[in-house]
């Protein structure tokens, strides 16, 4: 299967919530949005000071209960650009996933586990340009029984919380093959059927709770700007105003703005996800909010609201 990157431009650390100095604490929603108060957050992120001669920041995420959620290393504090081993945990403390990053992208083998500690699946990630090829190597059931071995077998996949079967079908040489059936529960429930040859989807059909039928050949189509992304940047260039406070201090930089493209093409939930001067952040959000011509994304053929990230650069030209 191939998953294109939608971002344009684009060892364990601490086992208990630390109380040490030389660290920064952030509050985040599951969407990745940074919020000001713990009461607004879904989890807590602690970024430790870099060790001498170390280029990476140790980053630990915690559930609101204080139990560890994930640990990893990053080149940047906000947003993280992970490098090397990254481990996530269930709130019980059991290991959920073990993976490796290179330059912020998942590479090599990802091992996922059931809440009971049994190996769930192993996936192999390979980078081809801006796309990622993902091969299914191993799939087991919760008792440890093998369903897929060496890239061949009948796979059963679950939702992230292991509450229901999300999809099932045949794996051949690490890729989806033949008919796949499943349930998609983002923005309402959809039942779907898809047909694959050599990992490439030929066609898909989904049905929502009201009986509406959707046909598609791409399971996920990201949002886009009317006329293309260059048209969006022309809109930015014609309307952006360099903040005087930032210009006076000769502050430049790139602002990464995350937002939702709603089902009607409007945008919402606009927020900045990297550490920049507040004046640059405010202006980037203002110009983005003034853009009106967004085309919503689709999942399983149905129009849905979808998250998007876009960079806006500020340069004084000297």
Specify the residue positions occupied by each region the protein language model found:
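Glycine/tyrosine- and acidic-biased, solvent-exposed loop/turn segments at the edges of beta-strands
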Residues: 20-248, 252-286, 290-303, 310-318
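Bacterial Sec-dependent N-terminal signal peptides
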Residues: 1-27, 236
């Amino acid at each position: 299967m191939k998953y294109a990157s939608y971002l344009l431009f684009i060892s364990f650390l601490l086992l208990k919530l630390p109380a040490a100095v030389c660290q920064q604490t952030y509050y985040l929603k599951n969407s990745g949005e940074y919020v000001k108060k713990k009461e607004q957050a879904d989890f807590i992120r602690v970024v430790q000071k870099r060790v001498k001669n170390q280029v990476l920041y140790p980053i630990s995420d915690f559930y609101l209960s204080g139990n560890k959620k994930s640990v990893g290393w990053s080149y940047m504090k906000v947003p993280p650009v992970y490098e090397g081993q990254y481990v996530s945990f269930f709130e019980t403390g059991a290991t959920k996933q073990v993976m490796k990053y290179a330059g912020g992208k998942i590479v090599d083998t990802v091992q996922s586990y059931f809440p009971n500690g049994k190996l769930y699946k192993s996936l192999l990630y390979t980078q081809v340009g801006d796309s990622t090829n993902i091969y299914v190597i191993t799939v087991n059931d919760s008792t440890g029984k093998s369903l897929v071995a060496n890239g061949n077998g009948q796979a059963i996949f679950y939702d992230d919380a292991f509450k229901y079967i999300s999809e099932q079908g045949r794996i051949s040489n690490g890729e989806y093959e033949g008919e796949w059936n499943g349930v998609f529960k983002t923005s309402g429930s959809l039942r779907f059927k898809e047909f694959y040859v050599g990992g490439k989807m030929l066609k898909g059909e989904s049905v929502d709770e009201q009986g509406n039928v959707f046909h598609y050949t791409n399971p996920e189509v990201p949002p886009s700007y009317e006329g293309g992304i260059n048209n969006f940047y022309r809109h930015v260039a014609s309307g952006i105003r360099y903040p005087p406070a930032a210009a006076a201090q000769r502050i430049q930089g790139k602002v990464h703005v995350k937002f939702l493209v709603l089902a009607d093409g409007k945008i919402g939930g606009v927020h900045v996800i990297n550490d920049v001067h507040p004046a640059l952040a405010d202006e980037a959000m203002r110009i983005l909010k003034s853009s009106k011509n967004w085309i919503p994304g689709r999942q399983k053929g149905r129009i849905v609201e979808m998250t998007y990230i876009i960079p806006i650069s500020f340069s004084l030209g000297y």
